[in-house]
Swiss-Prot record:
This is Phosphatidylinositol 3,4,5-trisphosphate 5-phosphatase 2. The modification Phosphothreonine is found at residue 165. Residues 119-132, 952-966 have a biased composition (Basic and acidic residues). Residues 156-166, 939-951, 1049-1060, 1088-1104 have a biased composition (Pro residues). It comes from Rattus norvegicus. A motif (SH3-binding) lies at residues 945-950. It is an enzyme of class 3 (hydrolase).
Length: 1257
């Protein structure tokens, strides 16, 4: 029995049939969930080990904890439970024998194995495959030259001898023999295979036997044809095909049924390539031999690309009202961009029809500053004289024109850059379900991103991209023919001979990657893979293909998939995705502990995902006719599943502004053909966005989606081709000018502490593994030195600095380290299995003081907890030199005053993704989160929310770090010298948004010394939860354009996974493992002890230490990032009884009514819209003068301190504040256990406090 994962088959260990307690490919988290639902001591199951191929894991529930034992095979295929040193090993031939022994008491396990836990199996109906896994009915294909179809020889006239194996009536040679075989299989053996699949089998032995018997004659015939074609090929090509030779030699070797089928498929593939290429070889050979044949024109190996013509843009100068009065009317300019010449010409038309023009070379254009509020406004900083700059703000015709102008200037900068290697490249992604029909001759609109949605401007469509990636499904064209078609189309379009990097196929699912000739030598470590997701992951027409490679120092991954079809098959599509995520073998083999979503700097996932719309067909058609897509996006299955964290955890997708791409009437884009005749009856296929492009990038990297749409003129298929173009930052293969690091100038990565909250019912110890390309080898920590849990489903584990290694990067240059990332995996000591993985960017960790990070853990595509810590990257002072990247040249200006403002808030383009670490300010800690929602902004007419504002570089606004050439200055004002501080290169905050502080409590570490002061410590800023769908502000908010808005707004870095509307958030000062839950109320109505609200603090009273004040700030912060409580809610339906005086953490779903409403896929929950930001600033200004830092109610720390002094218990004030009870308004809900945690141990004092609070109610 073959294993899907490629691991040794457990068939021998399991016997003839898999028992009910064995679960193939079950994840650790799912196993714990099954055991938690069983709920009885002695419940057990066996699953495949995640850490050792061919091994098993025995999971046992005892006292609500899951204990895991590894079952390892030895050299003689005997099985044994891994034991401690000195304990005798017991060997077993099968798992059944092993389970039988340990079902008896006192055999060394934590308890006897009493109750086997079976999996939740949902048998498919017999006609299920007809409904979802069979290709759609297609019209007959027209005859083509080089056809890949092959007839099966049958009938008594065949010269081949009959096979010697016994024949059955199903295999008789009749004109319809294969149909008879299919009929016999469905009548008899189908049920046996179905039972085998239910029992955990990964293959279909009876179907395999039937297919082998039916295709045996085809084997012989194909061998004959291949032999003849090989001889013919030798005549013309003078060389034989090694693949054909090897296939013919393997024919004499004994093969199993599955091997025969695989061999047949491979032969047919080779035969297809032979048939498509034999005519070209013959023609070339005959032309060479014929003296009368005209010589073929010599083609250069690399043709020069078409030159980009000079492009002109009509703009108006943006001036103040006073300047407009002086001038008389707005000035009109023409901006001419000469990419080839490296010049920008400003042409001004004057009243007397004279023209005044000024030319700026590329090196005198210092910075472009995009206005965020006015989408068609752009500031350009010019160099007038040495160290003097001038900024001019221009208003373009539309936001799309502004984006085209920026792209041309970036291309000009890149073309004339003195750098040997590029900082940024453009990537084209295309996906198309071709419907098993050959493509039309002209697919230029797909290649050039023309059509519906967010398309490129006509000025930039002809600019060639650096990398083209084409993913197709139901592509009946041969691999070589398809590749030639793509290269020919690109050559005709760009005059460049693009180089194929990789081509991978699985059935009719194909992915092809082509790059510019100049980049061919920058590509390395190419890898390809495929995964089948059909019946039992072995047969069917669905699956995925993938390609990965390194572009200099940046890793790329591309996955093209075709998932299960059918409106009702959402769960199966989700499982398809998880199978691909786990089984696709791409990227660095040393990162096998991580799934492919964490192996690459940039991962693009696209294809026919087949997620549909859950809405009545007539409603869908009405919305489409009115071009109202927002209501449809709310019921899009992919959006809903991502919101539930089921698939594509923390992936991003650009805003969808084009109509559904499926299912059109072939030959037209005016009509959706939503009726389909199936063998089981008429099916309804509602119009849907089946074809999608998503991506996931490491934090603190640069990626912008410039277009996302579909064509409207390619009509051969019932799907429309979809395109997306991306601007991606890349790194070079860094070579230090100072050579390798010596001991004296070595860089160090040092950890002060790490804390993880892991979703598990296990109570084992854990360790952390650290991986990075900047390390010579991976490193391990010691086991954690502290752990605690107040909830059975979660475990808090902590490591102090003693348990954490000091990492030594291979290079110490900051320019190298700021592009590096650290991969972490939290593994258990008992089974060495991963409980969660994450990635941390080093850029924000560089400095002499420790910075804090916070991110989420995931495993097998599921969120499994979060991790936070304190670390620093120490870089020698002589290696601090760095340079500006090309993508840092364009900035975002949140301030609409433009050049009139002395210090506008500017965000560098390179800092699109920021880490969760930055220095807090007094303003940040003082703004209550509730203010964000006091004045909800009205939605735009289309129903789409405005995009969240970009982060503002706080460091730049307080202490500008821009270089002189990048700092917008007023004319005639000398730029100040640049200020560099590499203590933390990226402190970025959102103006007016309260920032949640989540520092590590020093007292939470058993062995970590409490620092004497927190003056220089940086509190963690928790990233706001958001669904990774990028939104651009709608035109109309300060813009006069009728066209698409241009700028793409990337998310903040460490983008947390999207939370559903029902998500519950924990305050950082409350332990997520012990937080009480209010029953019987909705979240919005709950009046239990919410987190104490932040408010302005009074001056430090005498004797108060900065550390205690910092803890008070922490206790008052509001944290909306952690979804641990939500994970606890969904982990299991078991409602464990709480301890005395404590509410249960897991509420009954029937009792906790969660608010539901229309999902907002674009706006992070904690990002205020622009107008709300202004009100926040006003509110902060009003709140600041409040006496004693209190609120209008007069309740606060001062009131609580006075109350404690009045009853003679002021000694407990510090402990209560430290635990978050700093407000009398919420102190009335404190429990006896909460008092104990705050340090109130005296029973008399506890009773006095509680009685006094009761009387004050």
């Amino acid at each position: 029995m073959a294993s899907v994962c490629g691991a040794p088959s457990p068939g021998g260990a399991l016997g003839s049939q898999a028992p009910a307690w064995y679960h193939r490919d079950l994840s650790r988290a799912a196993a714990e969930e099954l055991l938690a639902r069983a709920g009885r001591d002695g419940s057990f199951l066996v699953r495949d080990s995640e850490s050792v191929a061919g091994a098993f894991a025995l999971c046992v529930l005892y006292q609500k904890h899951v204990h895991t034992y590894r079952i390892l095979p030895d050299g003689e295929d005997f099985l044994a439970v891994q034991t401690s040193q000195g304990v005798p090993v017991r060997r077993f031939q099968t798992l059944g024998e092993l389970i039988g022994l340990y079902a008896q008491p006192n055999q060394g396990l934590v308890c006897a194995l009493l109750l086997p836990v079976e999996g939740e199996r949902e048998p498919d109906p017999p006609d299920d495959r007809d409904a979802s896994d069979v290709e759609d009915e297609k019209p007959p294909l027209p005859p083509r030259s080089g056809s890949t179809s092959i007839s099966v020889p049958a009938g008594p006239s065949s010269p081949l001898p009959a096979p010697e194996t016994p024949t059955t009536p199903a295999a008789e040679s009749t004109p319809n023999g294969l149909s008879t075989v299919s009929h016999e299989y469905l009548k008899g053996s189908y049920g046996l295979d179905l039972e085998a699949v239910r029992g955990g089998a990964s293959n279909l032995p009876h179907l395999t036997r039937t297919l082998v018997t039916s295709c045996r004659r085809l084997h012989s015939e194909v061998d004959k044809v291949l032999s003849g074609l090989e001889i013919l090929s030798k005549v013309f090509d003078q060389q034989s095909s090694p693949m054909v030779t090897r296939l013919l030699q393997q024919q004499s070797l004994p093969q199993t049924g599955e091997q025969e089928l695989e061999s047949l498929v491979l032969k047919l593939s080779v035969l297809k390539d032979f048939l498509s290429g034999i005519q070209k070889k013959a023609l070339k050979a005959l032309q060479d031999m014929s003296s009368t044949a005209p010589p073929a024109p010599l083609q250069p190996s690399i043709r020069k690309a078409k030159t980009i013509p000079v492009q002109a843009f009509e703009v108006k100068l943006d001036v103040t009202l006073g300047d407009l009065t002086k001038i008389g009317k707005s000035q009109k300019f023409t901006l001419s961009v000469d990419v080839e010449g490296g010049r920008l010409v400003l042409l001004r038309r004057q009243r007397d029809s004279q023209e005044d023009w000024t030319t700026f070379t590329h090196d005198r254009i210092r910075q472009l500053i995009k206005s965020q509020r006015v989408q068609n406004k752009l500031g350009v900083v010019f160099e007038k004289e040495k160290d003097r700059t001038q900024r001019k703000d221009f208003i373009f015709v539309s936001a799309r024109k502004r984006e085209a102008f920026c792209q041309l200037l970036q291309l000009m900068k890149n073309k004339h850059s003195k750098q040997d290697e590029p900082d940024m490249i453009s990537v084209f992604i295309g996906t198309w379900n071709m419907g098993s029909v050959p493509p039309p001759k002209n697919v230029t609109s797909w290649f050039t991103s023309k059509g519906l949605g967010k398309a490129l401007d006509e000025v930039t469509v002809t600019i060639p991209h650096d990398i083209y990636v084409f993913g197709t499904q139901e592509n009946s064209v041969g691999d070589r023919e398809w590749l030639d078609l793509l290269r020919g189309g690109l050559k005709e379009l760009t005059d460049l001979d693009y180089r194929p990097i990789a081509m991978q196929s699985l059935w009719n699912i194909k992915v092809a990657v082509l790059v510019k000739p100049e980049h061919e030598n920058r590509i390395s470590h190419v890898s390809t893979s495929s995964v089948k997701t059909g019946i039992a992951n072995t047969l069917g027409n669905k699956g995925a293909v993938g390609v990965s490679f390194m572009f200099n120092g940046t890793s790329f991954g591309f996955v093209n998939c075709h998932l299960t079809s059918g409106n009702e098959k959402t769960t199966r599509r989700n499982q398809n995705y998880l199978d691909i995520l786990r089984l696709l073998s791409l990227g660095d083999r040393q990162l096998s502990a991580f799934d492919i979503s964490l192996r690459f700097t940039h991962l693009f996932w696209f294809g026919d995902l087949n997620y549909r719309l859950d809405m009545d067909i007539q409603e869908i058609l009405n919305y489409i006719s009115r071009r109202e897509f927002e209501p449809l996006l709310r019921v899009d299955q992919l959006n809903l599943e991502r919101e539930k964290h089921k698939v594509f955890l923390r992936f991003s997708e650009e805003e969808i502004s084009f109509p559904p791409t499926y299912r059109y009437e072939r030959g037209s884009r005016d009509t959706y053909a939503w009726h389909k005749q199936k063998p089981t009856g008429v099916r309804t296929n509602v119009p849907s966005w089946c074809d999608r492009i998503l991506w996931k990038s490491y934090p603190e990297t640069h990626i912008i989606c410039n277009s996302y749409g579909c064509t409207d003129d390619i009509v051969t298929s019932d799907h429309s081709p979809v395109f997306g173009t991306f601007e991606v930052g890349v790194t070079s293969q860094f070579i230090s000018k100072k050579g390798l690091s010596k001991t004296s100038d070595q860089a160090y990565i040092e950890f002060e502490s790490i804390e993880a909250i892991v979703k598990t019912a296990s109570r084992t110890k854990f360790f952390i593994e650290f991986y990075s390309t900047c390390l010579e080898e991976y490193k391990k920590s010691f086991e954690n030195d502290a752990q605690s849990s107040d909830n059975i489903n979660f475990l808090k584990v902590q490591w102090s600095s003693r348990q954490l290694p000091t990492l030594k990067p291979i290079l110490a240059d900051i320019e190298y380290l700021q592009d590096q990332h650290l991969l972490l995996t939290v593994k258990s000591m008992d089974g060495y299995e991963s409980y969660g993985e994450c990635v941390v960017a080093l850029k924000s960790m560089i400095g002499s003081t420790a910075q804090q990070f916070l991110t989420f853990l995931s495993h097998r595509g599921e969120e499994t907890g979060n991790i936070r810590g304190s670390m620093k990257v120490r870089v020698p002072t002589e290696r601090l030199g760095t340079r500006e990247r090309l993508y840092e040249w364009i900035s975002i200006d949140k301030d609409d005053t433009g050049a009139k403002s002395k210090a506008p808030s500017v965000l560098r383009g390179s800092q699109e993704h920021r880490s969760g670490s930055r220095k807090p300010t007094s303003t940040e800690a003082s703004c209550p989160l509730s203010k964000l929602f006091e004045e909800p902004e009205k939605p735009p007419p289309t129903g789409r929310p405005p995009a969240p504002p970009r982060a503002v570089p706080r460091e730049e606004s307080l202490n500008p770090r821009l270089k002189s050439e990048g700092t917008p200055e007023q004319e005639g004002v000398a730029a100040p010298p640049p200020k560099n501080s590499f203590n933390n290169p990226a402190y970025y905050v959102l103006e007016g948004v309260p920032h949640q502080l989540l520092p590590l409590e020093p007292t939470s570490f058993a062995r970590a010394p409490i620092p004497p002061t927190t003056k220089n410590k940086v509190a963690i800023t928790v990233p706001a939860p958001q669904l990774g769908r990028h939104r651009t502000p709608r035109v109309g908010e300060g813009s006069s354009s009728d066209e698409d808005s241009g700028g793409t707004l990337p998310p903040p870095d460490f983008p947390p996974p999207p939370l559903p509307d029902s998500a519950i958030f924990l305050p950082p000062n409350l332990d997520p493992l012990s937080m009480p839950v209010v029953r019987g109320r909705s979240v919005g109505e709950a009046r239990g002890p919410p987190p104490p609200k932040a408010h302005p603090r009074p001056p430090l009273p005498p004797g108060t230490s900065p550390a205690s004040t910092f803890l008070e700030e922490v206790a008052s912060a509001d944290d909306r990032s952690c979804s641990v409580l939500q994970m606890a809610k969904t982990l299991s339906e078991v409602d464990y009884s709480p301890g005395p005086g404590r509410s249960a953490l897991l509420p009954n779903p029937l009792e906790l009514q969660l608010p539901r409403g229309p999902s907002d896929y674009g706006r992070p929950l904690s990002f205020p819209p622009p107008r709300i930001r202004e009100s926040i600033q006003e509110d902060l200004a009003e709140e600041a003068p409040c006496p004693q830092g209190g609120r209008a109610s007069g309740l606060g720390e001062a009131g609580m301190g006075a109350w404690l002094r009045a009853i003679g218990l002021e000694r407990y004030e510090e402990g209560l504040v430290h635990n978050g009870w700093d407000d009398l308004e919420f102190l009335s809900d404190i429990t006896e256990e909460d008092l104990e945690e705050a340090g109130v141990q005296d029973p008399a004092h506890k009773r006095l406090l509680l009685d006094t609070l009761q009387l004050s109610k």
